[in-house]
């Protein structure tokens, strides 16, 4: 008799005491049985770990499958995900964030899709949760893998690391880890490369993950070092996609990826760092790209040095 697929859910934990209860309960209450839980304590300064362990006590049938791994010093999100994978034993890895929550049948649906398709990576739709508002988000995964990779590069498909069921042997054999410190851009570095290398990518046509945003969570301004790591992430991605045999198939998508990255940089930067952002990717024409009109206008205004207006638009309107 074939052994059941085992899943390792890996969750970095830092500063999550407001959210950890709902997150952990949603993981413990999965209808799928064969799950281990790897919580990586990235030196959180609050009571997240104590609260997590208190919640686990309510699920004695799961307690033996719960493991907390402690970092000796704060290392960031990408390093925490890496640690989770290295401590996992499941056939598949499921990365998850400590402020989100899962539908009870989520892992069962992911596993069923993996069994049916043999995919290295399985994704699903998700709900965008903001306060009392729940908005379903439908993603597109074309049957042609090259089309999907191009959609990822150009941000037409979701590039999140969380909420994907990924074969553990596929990760380890291909060393699919983001470099430590690329916490703002780990998704963008990893997911297009994973999709390119995967023998098959599959999708569950249902919203299984609840991705939670809180007031103020999207308006953080990062320091210059964070901007530099985001530029570095694009360089890493470009190095990979210009070094493959079919690089020409992704040349135009890479150019557009840089423009999307520039928009992201403006969204992250303090106004004082706009000159640094403005200096990036100026060899790529904006108006002949397939960026939406709002992003084209934003980059044009920024190119005209209308920094105050650009900052106002970014932080008061959705771009």
Q: Residues of each region from the PLM?
A:
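Membrane-interface aromatic/basic loop that binds lipid-linked glycans or pyrophosphate carriers
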Residues: 270-319
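Catalytic core of nucleotide-sugar-dependent glycosyltransferases
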Residues: 199, 208-214, 220-248, 261-288
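Glycine-centered secondary-structure boundary/capping sites
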Residues: 181, 245, 305-306
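Exposed alpha-helical structural elements
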Residues: 51, 147-149, 249, 276, ...
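Polar/charged side chains located within well-ordered beta-strands of beta-rich proteins
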Residues: 43, 71, 164, 258-261, ...
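Alpha-solenoid repeat scaffolds
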Residues: 59-62, 178, 248, 287-292
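Nucleotide-sugar donor-binding/catalytic module of glycosyltransferases
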Residues: 1-231, 301
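All-alpha amphipathic helical-bundle segments outside canonical DNA-binding/catalytic cores
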Residues: 247-256
